[in-house]
Amino acid sequence: MTATVEDPHPQINAEIAKWVRNKDLVLDGVNVSQRLRSFQTPILCVFGNQDGVVPPGTARAHADDMASTDKTILGIGTKSSPFAHGDLFVGTGAHHQVFEPIAEFLNTRLR
């Protein structure tokens, strides 16, 4: 996969760029980033090490801002086997490296 999504919708790309630049995601006038700071439920943050859509630092920063005491940060990919945004869903190894840890995270909290 490529490091970014090819031919993204310009409006979506602009929203993501604004979110990354301002470090705040605002949707329909609601500052989602501020609301997440009071989020208490378990958090699983998954990102690819070469994600060009939501860079790892951005994903990690928002997870770090959340109030939950039950946080799992799952960075996928290595220098020799990088993961971009789309790789998280359809990349080689996604089943084992992404979906199995997600299932485990959910299963341990639903018991």
Q: What do the predicted segments below correspond to?
A:
Residues 39, 45-47, 51:
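Short beta-strand/loop motif that positions the catalytic acidic residue
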Residues 1-4, 29-32, 86-93:
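Active-site rim elements
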Residues 32, 41, 55-65:
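Short alpha-helix in the alpha/beta-hydrolase fold that links the catalytic acid
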Residues 17-35:
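Active-site nucleophile elbow and catalytic-triad environment of alpha/beta-hydrolase enzymes
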Residues 7, 11, 57, 97:
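Conserved active-site and cofactor/substrate-binding residues in soluble primary-metabolism enzymes
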Residues 1-23:
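Hydrolase active-site cap/lid region
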Residues 69-111:
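Catalytic active-site module of serine/aspartate enzymes centered on a nucleophile-bearing elbow/loop
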